């Protein structure tokens, strides 16, 4: 079966170097940590991975989580109160939505990637103490990329922080795959990044928040998913360290991804399919019919190609089926 719908963007989930690194780390450090980070769940390997992620994103510090859902769920409540404002893209991931709900800050929502609507929200939020703009780097259902340069321009104009979830963009977009800040040259203008080790970076599990040191320090003290969840297991740490080592050695994996995405898009469009144009690796094949999408998926699986049809329960109610 050929898998066409996993988030294994760089093909690392079954790479022999990662498998070997994971096995070797378990041989040395065991299967699990049996503790949260602040008791006895922090080893040198956790700090080493946090440093590798900081280096990759050109940030000051990083905090690891069990999943990016935890990173997004645990970032807002420790940092913002009823005096503040969170301004969130309407198509942000469910983990961001849930994280915002846990926080007492005033909430604003702007239409997907609509900079005029974002500016309206920023203007309305000027009375709040702190403001933060929150967006996915790549929106997972259609592959659209957030216009980070314009978002950062507005953030600077209206004195707001910026947070981006790089789950579907890190390892994928940008000249060398370093994400939306590389694509739009917004290094130093984004205050908080969240991301996952479960997509381009190996495909297993684990999440992180990376950014300014004072923000990460505060999260270490107050972020509940970090404080009350077991540390990432040594096998995950070992493989993840190998991922960042490989990405530093060569851009070959990203170059191959770009080649494959371009080939797929070109061939599908030449065959008459409607594919949304994006700069990401997500290729949404639009069928505009829920039943037809399920028929296509079933027939493809019968032919040995694994795909999934998405429709209203998983995507925005106004969006067509893919």
Predicted regions and their residues:
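PLP-dependent aminotransferase class I/II
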Residues: 201-268, 273-276
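Active-site PLP attachment segment
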Residues: 176, 182-218
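Conserved PLP-anchoring active-site segment centered on the Schiff-base-forming lysine
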Residues: 75-94
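Conserved PLP-binding catalytic core of the aspartate aminotransferase-like
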Residues: 12, 255-303
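N-terminal "arm"/small-domain region of PLP-dependent enzymes with the aminotransferase-like
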Residues: 1-31, 160
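Residue-level detector of conserved catalytic or cofactor/ligand-binding positions
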Residues: 312-322
């Amino acid at each position: 079966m050929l898998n066409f719908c996993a988030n294994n963007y760089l093909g690392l989930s079954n790479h022999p170097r990662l498998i070997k690194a994971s096995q070797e780390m378990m041989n040395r450090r065991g299967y699990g940590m049996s503790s949260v980070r602040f008791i006895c769940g922090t080893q040198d390997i956790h700090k080493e991975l946090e440093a590798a992620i900081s280096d990759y994103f050109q940030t000051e510090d990083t905090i690891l989580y069990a999943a990016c859902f935890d990173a997004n769920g645990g970032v807002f409540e420790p940092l913002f109160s009823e005096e503040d404002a969170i301004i969130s893209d309407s198509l942000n991931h469910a983990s961001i939505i849930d994280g915002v709900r846990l926080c007492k800050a005033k909430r604003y929502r702007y239409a997907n990637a609509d900079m005029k609507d974002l500016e309206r929200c920023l203007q309305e939020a000027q009375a709040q103490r702190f403001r933060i703009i929150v967006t996915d780097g790549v929106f997972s259902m259609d592959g659209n990329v957030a216009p980070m340069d314009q978002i950062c321009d507005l953030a600077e104009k209206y004195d707001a922080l910026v947070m981006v979830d790089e789950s579907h963009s890190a390892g994928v977009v940008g000249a060398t795959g370093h994400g939306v800040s590389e694509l739009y040259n917004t290094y130093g203008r984004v205050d908080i990044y969240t991301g996952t080790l479960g997509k381009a970076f190996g495909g297993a599990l684990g999440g992180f928040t990376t950014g300014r040191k004072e923000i990460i320090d505060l999260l270490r003290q107050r972020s509940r998913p970090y404080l009350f969840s077991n540390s990432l297991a040594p096998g995950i740490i070992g493989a993840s360290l190998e991922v960042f080592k490989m990405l530093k050695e060569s851009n070959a994996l990203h170059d191959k991804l770009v080649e494959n995405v371009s080939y797929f898009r070109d061939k599908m469009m030449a065959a008459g399919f409607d594919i949304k144009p994006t700069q990401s690796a997500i290729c949404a094949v639009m069928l505009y019919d829920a039943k037809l999408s399920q028929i296509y998926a079933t027939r493809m699986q019968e032919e040995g190609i694994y795909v999934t049809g998405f429709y209203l329960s998983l995507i925005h109610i106004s969006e067509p089926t893919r």
